[in-house]
Amino acid sequence: MRPSESRRVDVNLKGWMMNIYQIYSAVDNKDAYADLKQADGKIIDFINYNEGRYTNEAIFIAQRGYTSTNIHQTDYVQTIPKMLLFSENFTYKLAETLKNELDFFPAKLKIKDEEFKFFLGKIKLAANLVDMEKSSFYEIDGEKFIDHPPVFLKNISGFEFCAKDINDNLIWVFLDKFKELVISNHFKIEFLPLA
């Protein structure tokens, strides 16, 4: 599901003012997501936190919002836990262009008794994205976490397509250049401006 609130942020990249976005599946229903089958945490630690190595191929189980027919209507699948899961076609076509900012690792998506080849995307670059003074926080067991939605900084730089926040590995943004790449290659990914 898409969040009801978002914020617009202009990104200053080499003199250009750009929007930042979150990405979503083009299959828009509340049950369109996939759960990671493995429970050991090593895949999550590697993809999201850059810890360890990618030794076992991730397997995702699609929930009832995806079918063997409508899975071809999207090139990005939301996952639980939160990771980037892209279609095989997207990855083969754009991996070289995105190689400085995204690494891709093979994964499987199971829909009932069918398997589809997908790829996990691992964001390589971290940048100061969140305005730590204006954002709200919550605590769990004495550890402080950024409350969502965060307030983003007005001038963000240091990347072309996507980055994760330097303080929170699960806050990601995608720039206009990424959106233009998706649109010009006719990929099916939805964009929500963080405005």
Predicted feature residues:
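Short coil/turn motifs at helix boundaries and re-entrant loops, enriched in small/polar
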Residues: 84-91, 171-176
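Short secondary-structure capping micro-motifs at structural edges
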Residues: 76-82, 89-92, 103-110
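Short, Lys/Arg-enriched N-terminal segments with co-localized hydrophobic residues
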Residues: 3-17
